[in-house]
Design a protein with these regions (language model features):
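Sec-dependent N-terminal signal peptides
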Residues: 4-15
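Short, well-ordered amphipathic alpha-helices
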Residues: 39-42, 72-80, 130-138
Length: 149
């Protein structure tokens, strides 16, 4: 019985590691010199001259960090599903927000009531880097600018 459990755990570990290998590890350096780690899932088969959607997957606060892996925890396997990859071919960007930052604000609001939201503030440095990264991918000829999700 212990051997069966051990083999099962080894199999699950292998699946998880192989998922991380399919997503290319990348680091984007912004015009301000900030770095933004991200993963890129490319198409299995890309047809010359065809445009494909771009999916930008922003994780929650629990996946922030610097390992360039935690952002794959929720959603990473879904995009690798062979049925999804064949039926919905797309480039998938999965950036990782640094542990000391948030995607939207430089400081987290006390509540999310509209009147408490910071209006007129500059976007956070990490979001600025994300915008630049997105612009790079939108300039690529194989990306359909009308299908960014």
């Amino acid at each position: 019985m212990k051997k069966i459990i051990s083999l099962g755990l080894l199999f699950l570990l292998t699946i998880s590691v192989s998922a991380q290998e399919v997503y290319q590890k990348e680091v984007f350096i912004s015009s301000r010199g900030d770095s933004l780690k991200y993963r890129l899932l490319r198409l299995e088969k890309e047809k010359a001259g065809k445009k494909y959607p771009l999916v930008l997957f922003l994780h929650g606060a629990g996946e922030r960090g610097s390992d360039n892996e935690k952002q794959l925890v929720h959603g990473g396997q879904m995009f690798l599903n062979p049925v999804n990859r064949e039926k919905y071919p797309a480039f998938v960007l999965m950036p990782q927000c640094p542990i000391d930052a948030y995607w939207a604000y430089t400081s987290r609001p006390v509540s999310f009531v509209p009147s408490d939201m910071p209006a007129g503030q500059e976007i956070s440095p990490v979001f600025s880097s994300l915008k630049e990264l997105l612009d790079v991918y939108l300039s690529m000829p194989q990306i359909d600018k009308d299908r960014v999700y």
